[in-house]
């Protein structure tokens, strides 16, 4: 099997002529897909431009996906959330302290309506080829487990809406200490918002492609993050998702970690007849030896990955999260993209 799609994320939605020049550079770097990181501010302020930018990408032959980047801080991303600015309620609440946190509770009707309106409006207006669900997650007041640390005790969300739904379903008050019922409840509610919006998008246009990208964590006996999308079988099995994707792994992590995450990603996707996607870290950090990029892409190829993604265009050049050698990093990723896409033709 060959890698058939190579994607890169893109922030700059202000001017079509600038975007078109950037799209040409993406093509020169072997990209087949651009993921437009559409912020809540972009939606409110630059929305008339988005269809024109999509059209420019299509004219050049790029597939276009829309990422509601950082929306409500429910998705990954550094952008500021207008929903949180305008809503002092509808926030995720710490189970142990009762503190309202700067993350929208995606189980509330208010945020679900906001998210659906955002996505469905763009589905009607923008003319893109699909949507990219970008690292959806519950908040972690104490930074739940990662590959380098143990699990924290606190979790979300224990807001009045979540507590009411839990009580209605299970017949008792949602506990402050996470149990199996809480884990199941959180996963079910987390999946609902994405499935419901994906279903409605596909009702508008059945050809719309939906990628769901979840955190690349081991979820083993020792390390389980409980982000809400940790059961990869549940996510990959959804009839509303076309591509099962797992997120970036930092370059300094062991190669065995890359391999295990990739094997599990491909296995979950194949089990449910979905395309698999793995990512390259193209910002902030870079490998000590750029040959590690080549080796990682070769690993992805050898394990049967269908698609590659890179965050972000030009290595984040000009941003606070730029890689030290951002343009060189971007060029090396481009060399690998051109190589694998050449094989896929």
Model-derived segments and spans:
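Aromatic-lined substrate-binding rim segments of carbohydrate-active enzymes
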Residues: 22-23, 35-86, 185-204
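Active-site-adjacent "subsite" loops/lids of carbohydrate-active enzymes
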Residues: 66-126, 166-180, 195, 291-293
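Substrate-binding cleft of secreted/luminal carbohydrate-active enzymes
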Residues: 246-254, 277-344
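Substrate-binding cleft/loops of secretory-pathway carbohydrate-active enzymes
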Residues: 141, 194-258, 285-299
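The substrate-binding groove and active-site-proximal loops of carbohydrate-active enzymes
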Residues: 7-14, 35-44, 97-116, 175-191, ...
């Amino acid at each position: 099997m060959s890698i058939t799609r190579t994607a890169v994320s893109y922030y700059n939605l202000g001017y079509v002529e600038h975007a078109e020049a950037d799209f040409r550079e993406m093509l020169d770097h072997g990209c087949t897909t651009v993921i437009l990181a559409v912020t809540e501010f972009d939606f409110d302020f630059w929305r008339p431009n988005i269809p024109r930018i999509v059209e420019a990408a299509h004219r050049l032959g790029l597939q276009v996906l829309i990422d509601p980047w950082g929306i409500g801080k429910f998705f990954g991303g550094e952008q500021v959330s207008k929903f949180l600015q305008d809503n002092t309620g509808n926030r995720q609440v710490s189970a142990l302290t009762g503190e309202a946190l700067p993350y929208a509770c995606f189980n509330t009707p208010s945020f679900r309506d906001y998210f659906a309106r955002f996505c469905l409006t763009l589905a009607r207006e923008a003319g893109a080829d699909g949507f990219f669900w970008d690292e959806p997650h519950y908040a972690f007041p104490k930074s739940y487990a990662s590959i380098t640390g143990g699990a924290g005790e606190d979790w979300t969300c224990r807001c009045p809406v979540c507590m009411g739904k839990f009580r209605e379903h299970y017949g008792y008050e949602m506990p402050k200490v996470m149990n199996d019922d809480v884990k199941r409840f959180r996963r079910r509610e987390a999946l609902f918002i994405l499935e419901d919006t994906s279903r409605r998008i596909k009702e508008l246009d059945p050809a719309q492609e939906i990628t769901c990208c979840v955190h690349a964590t081991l979820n083993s006996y020792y390390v389980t993050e409980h982000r809400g999308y940790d059961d990869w079988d549940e996510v990959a099995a959804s009839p509303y998702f076309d591509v099962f994707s797992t997120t970036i792994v930092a370059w300094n992590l062991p190669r065995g970690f890359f391999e295990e995450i990739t094997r599990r990603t491909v296995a979950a996707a194949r089990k449910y007849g979905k395309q698999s996607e793995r990512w390259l870290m193209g910002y902030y950090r870079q490998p000590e030896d750029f040959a590690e990029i080549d080796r990682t892409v070769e690993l992805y190829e050898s394990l049967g990955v269908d698609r590659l993604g890179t965050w972000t265009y030009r290595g984040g050049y000009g941003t606070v999260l730029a890689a030290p050698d951002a343009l060189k990093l971007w060029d090396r990723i481009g060399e690998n993209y051109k190589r694998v896409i050449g094989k896929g033709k």
